[in-house]
């Protein structure tokens, strides 16, 4: 499992999400929790969401090349993420890996889990507290919106959101299911009693719906 943290692409760190590793390991997975540069970066080295997506592609290419040395199986990798990380997980599912590295199978990533993910970034350009950091252009918003892409040819995305999340997060959860369809998104659920933050900890608890869905997706 490669897990990508959230934080609206502008905050938090992999260290804040290391708690997801032990329960996933207990399910039988080799776990990689990745970092990325945060928006807006610096004047000398600005960071955009497409830049972050490219960093995640490079991180996944590293995983393909190296995970076997750490006890993982490069042919059975699930990418998961929360919030902004869920958005990036959906993007990676749709990636044509042959364009990245001819040695990587075109549809290498077959399984993705998006927890409270975002799939259409165009409305964020009208959200001042985010736009100040993200500096999304219309072009970048379209480029980085999985809901505006054709559905992936192969692979499945499980998408979930907490029942107590904002209407916009619930809309995004339904949106990707509507756009990509039930064949690609066979699981689209709202988990009752969970908000945008408690849903992540639910992943780590045995016996929860999210834990069960994760285990089923991993198929370990």
Located regions from the model:
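Alpha/beta-hydrolase superfamily serine-hydrolase fold, recognizing
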Residues: 1-220
């Amino acid at each position: 499992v490669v897990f990508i943290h959230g934080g609206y692409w502008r905050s938090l760190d992999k260290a804040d999400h290391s708690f997801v590793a032990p329960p996933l390991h207990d399910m039988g997975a080799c776990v990689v929790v990745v970092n990325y540069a945060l928006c807006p970066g610096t004047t000398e080295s600005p960071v955009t969401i497409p830049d972050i997506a490219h960093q995640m592609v490079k991180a996944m290419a590293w995983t393909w090349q190296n995970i076997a040395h750490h006890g993982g199986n490069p042919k059975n990798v699930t990418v998961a993420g929360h919030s902004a990380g869920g958005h990036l997980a959906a993007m990676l599912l749709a990636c044509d890996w042959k364009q990245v590295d001819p040695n990587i199978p075109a549809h290498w990533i077959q399984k993705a889990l998006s927890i409270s993910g975002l799939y259409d970034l165009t409305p964020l350009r009208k959200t001042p507290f985010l736009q100040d950091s993200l500096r999304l252009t219309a072009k970048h918003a379209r480029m980085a919106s999985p809901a505006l892409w054709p559905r992936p040819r192969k692979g499945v995305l499980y998408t979930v959101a907490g029942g107590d999340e904002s209407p916009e997060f619930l809309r995004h959860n339904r949106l990707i299911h509507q756009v990509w369809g039930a064949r690609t998104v066979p699981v689209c659920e709202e988990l009752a009693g969970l908000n945008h933050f408690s849903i992540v900890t639910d992943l780590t608890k045995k016996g929860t719906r999210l834990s069960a869905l994760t285990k089923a997706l991993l198929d370990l």
